[in-house]
């Protein structure tokens, strides 16, 4: 259910930034 939320728009519970995919993916990849 996290995929549709990411594509839908900027999730405040995931990243909270207006980068959506960029912010979410970048953060996820950067996280250990």
UniProtKB/Swiss-Prot annotation:
Listed Gene3D superfamilies: Oxygen-evolving enhancer protein 3 (PsbQ), four-helix up-down bundle (1.20.120.290)
Listed GO CC annotations: chloroplast thylakoid membrane; photosystem II
Major subcellular location class: plastid
Keywords: Chloroplast, Membrane, Photosynthesis, Photosystem II, Plastid, Thylakoid
One GO BP annotation of this record: photosynthesis
Keyword Membrane among record annotations: yes
Localization: Plastid, Chloroplast thylakoid membrane
Disulfide bonds: none
Annotated region described as Disordered, given as residue ranges: 1-32
Record-stated family: Belongs to the PsbQ family.
Full protein name: Oxygen-evolving enhancer protein 3
């Amino acid at each position: 259910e996290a995929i549709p939320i990411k594509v839908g728009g900027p999730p405040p519970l995931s990243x909270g930034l207006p980068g959506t995919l960029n912010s979410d993916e970048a953060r996820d990849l950067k996280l250990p």
